[in-house]
Amino acid sequence: MVKVLLALTSYNETFYSDGKKTGVFVVEALHPFEVFRKKGYEIQLASETGTFGWDDHSVVPDFLNGEDKEIFDNVNSEFNVALKNLKKASDLDPNDYDIFFGSAGHGTLFDYPNAKDLQKIATTVYDKGGVVSAVCHGPAIFENLNDPKTGEPLIKGKKITGFTDIGEDILGVTDIMKKGNLLTIKQVAEKEGATYIEPEGPWDNFTVTDGRIVTGVNPQSAVKTAEDVIAAFECN
């Protein structure tokens, strides 16, 4: 059976100007989970510390409604059962996984770049011929992520996408990120020698596949990102 490591951010602190916390953006974990579940893949949720919290803005009706909210509210849904089995990345065997998927939320900007154990799983997956993927702010996992075989950044020379700088401006967090020395995904790409591909609009359903690296730009792209991961894995 194909095994997926679905990564969550551990960061769950005040971030937004309205005093709300960032953390895991619900649908950016839920949508990939459901795509992989329906495909019959086995999914393990993990974070760097074994803990997580939700992004406050991701649980409002604009972003969480309909069937998604039903799954979220059902304590017995497979998604919530999997959350109860959340693991600390260091407690897992990186060799067990075929796919790495980095879910998002601004929290990832704080912990993914230095999440050595999550990153070890990602590089191991890639080294064994699997797919490494992320959506929205999830590509923060690529910051400081080097291919152990070459010592070079894993995404060097690759094309990726992720949440746009314009999107950060619209959300009013650009200055907050600058004060915290947090890189935008475009800046991560530039730092690591990748080419950032920008969608026409910040809320477009938009993904980029470059070999075994698959990325998506925002919550609206989470389903397609996971679908593209499956396509990349099956073509591999």
UniProtKB/Swiss-Prot annotation:
Keywords: Lyase, Oxidation, Stress response. It comes from Candida albicans (strain SC5314 / ATCC MYA-2876) (Yeast). Belongs to the peptidase C56 family. HSP31-like subfamily. The active site is at C136, H137, E168. GO terms for cellular component: cytoplasm; fungal biofilm matrix; hyphal cell wall; yeast-form cell wall. Its EC number is 4.2.1.130. The modification Cysteine sulfinic acid (-SO2H) is found at C136. Monomer. It comes from the Eukaryota. The lineage of its organism: Eukaryota, Fungi, Dikarya, Ascomycota, Saccharomycotina. GO terms for biological process: methylglyoxal catabolic process to D-lactate via S-lactoyl-glutathione. Disruption phenotype: Has a 3- to 5-fold increase in levels of intracellular methylglyoxal compared with wild-type cells grown in the same media. It is an enzyme of class 4 (lyase). Catalyzes the conversion of methylglyoxal (MG) to D-lactate in a single glutathione (GSH)-independent step. Selective for MG, does not use glyoxal as substrate. Plays a role in detoxifying endogenously produced MG, particularly when glycerol is the principal carbon source. Important for viability in stationary phase. Coiled coil: none annotated. One of its GO terms (molecular function) is glyoxalase III activity. It catalyses: methylglyoxal + H2O = (R)-lactate + H(+). This is Glyoxalase 3.
